[in-house]
Amino acid sequence: MSTAGKVIKCKAAVLWEQKKPFSIEEVEVAPPKAHEVRIKMVAAGICRSDDHVVSGTLVAPLPVIAGHEAAGIVESIGEGVTTVRPGDKVIPLFIPQCGKCSVCKHPEGNLCLKNLSMPRGTMQDGTSRFTCRGKPIHHFLGTSTFSQYTVVDEISVAKIDAASPLEKVCLVGCGFSTGYGSAVKVAKVTQGSTCAVFGLGGVGLSVIMGCKAAGAARIIGVDINKDKFAKAKEVGATECVNPQDYKKPIQEVLTEMSNGGVDFSFEVIGRLDTMVAALSCCQEAYGVSVIVGVPPDSQNLSMNPMLLLSGRTWKGAIFGGFKSKDSVPKLVADFMAKKFALDPLITHVLPFEKINEGFDLLRSGKSIRTILTF
C-alpha cells in the first residue's frame, strides 16, 4: 500500500533538552511539499557535530531531530521534483547545492546561500514536517536523519549508485567527504609532500586517506590517545606522535621532525590551541594549514599575524570543499570503483533504537564511526 501523499507515523530520536539522552518517540512525518523529497532512512552515522548539539556547543533550537550523515531510499516526492524518483538510493546533503546562487556558480565555493543554518531548524519554506506529541519538532541542517523517515528539500539530496551499500556509503554524507576533501580539494596536497594531521577520529583518518591518495610521502598523525595510532597507520599515516610524550610544544616537535615545518597541516579536533599549533608547525614560507574541526560557537582566537606574514596560508572548509549535489554521486562511484575504503572507519553497527549507546561510544573514545541501522 502506497504511503505517498499521506502522513507517516514512525520512530525518531528526539532531543528534548540539552545534555539529556535522545528519546525514541513516535513522530508524524508530513508528506513532501513541492520540490521536497521524503526519504526512508536505511543507515545513519553518528558524527561529533551531532554530539555538539546535545552538549550545547552548537546551538540548535529544541526539540530537534538531529543527524546529518546518512543514506536511504526515496519514499515519495513532491510536485516539481526532477532529480530523484521513488525507489532511488540517496544521500541527504547538510550543505545544499541550489546551482543558482553566487556561491554555487563560483568554481571554488560550496557553502550554498540556501544553506539552512543550525539556528533555523526548518525546511527551506520556514516550516517543519515533523510533529510529536502534538508539537512541531525542529529539523537539523535540513537533513534530520535520526528518524525512520525524513523530508528534505530537493537541493539537499543526491541520487547515488543503485548498487551501493548504504550502511557504508552513508559516511560520504559527512565524515569521510569532510576529511578526504580537506586534503585533496582544499589543501590540494602535493606528491611527495609532508603532512601533519591533528586528531585521529573518523574525519582525521579520512584526511590521512586523502593525503595518501594525493601522494604525500610523509603523513604524521597527532593525538593524545595512542590507541588510535594503529588505525591511523593502517589507513596511511607513516608515523604518529603523542604531544603528552614531549616537554616542548607539539609545533616545535613537528617542525624539527620535518626539517623546518610540514607542507600541509590539518586541525581535525575543533580546539583553538591546536588550530594555532597546526598553523605554527607548517613551513613558514609556503606551508598550508586547514581548519577542519568545528570550533565552539562563542570563542575567538588570538594568534600572532607574523605566522601568516611570512607566507603561510590558513584555510577552512565545510564538507571538504565539495559541491554537494555534484560531488556525492562521484565519491560514491569512486568507492564502488575501490578508489578508497570505508570499512576502516566503521567500528560499531547498532540498531537505531540504541542511539544513546552509540553516543556513549563516541564520548568515551571507543568508536571511530558508529552506524545506526533502521
Swiss-Prot record:
Recorded GO MF terms: all-trans-retinol dehydrogenase (NAD+) activity; zinc ion binding
Entry EC no(s): 1.1.1.1
Localisation per UniProt entry: Cytoplasm
Cofactor note: Binds 2 Zn(2+) ions per subunit.
InterPro entries per record: ADH-like_C, ADH-like_N, ADH_Zn_CS, GroES-like_sf, NAD(P)-bd_dom_sf, PKS_ER
Superkingdom per UniProt: Eukaryota
UniProt-listed SUPFAM superfamilies: GroES-like, NAD(P)-binding Rossmann-fold domains
UniProt-listed GO biological process terms: retinoic acid metabolic process; retinol metabolic process
Ligase listed as a keyword: no
Cofactor section: Zn(2+)
Binding-site residues for Zn(2+) 2, renumbered to this chain: 98, 101, 104, 112
UniProtKB keywords: Acetylation, Cytoplasm, Metal-binding, NAD, Oxidoreductase, Zinc
Residues noted as binding NAD(+) in the record, renumbered to the chain: 199-204, 223, 228, 292-294, 369
Chemical reaction(s) catalysed: a primary alcohol + NAD(+) = an aldehyde + NADH + H(+); a secondary alcohol + NAD(+) = a ketone + NADH + H(+)
Modified residues (N-acetylserine): 2
Pfam family, one: ADH_zinc_N
Positions bound to Zn(2+) 1: 47, 68, 174
A Gene Ontology cellular-component term: cytosol
Family indicated by similarity: Belongs to the zinc-containing alcohol dehydrogenase family. Class-I subfamily.
PANTHER family assigned: ALCOHOL DEHYDROGENASE, ALCOHOL DEHYDROGENASE 1A
Quaternary structure note: Dimer of identical or non-identical chains of two types (E and S) coded by 2 separate genes at different loci.
Protein name (Swiss-Prot/TrEMBL): Alcohol dehydrogenase S chain
Organism of provenance: Equus caballus
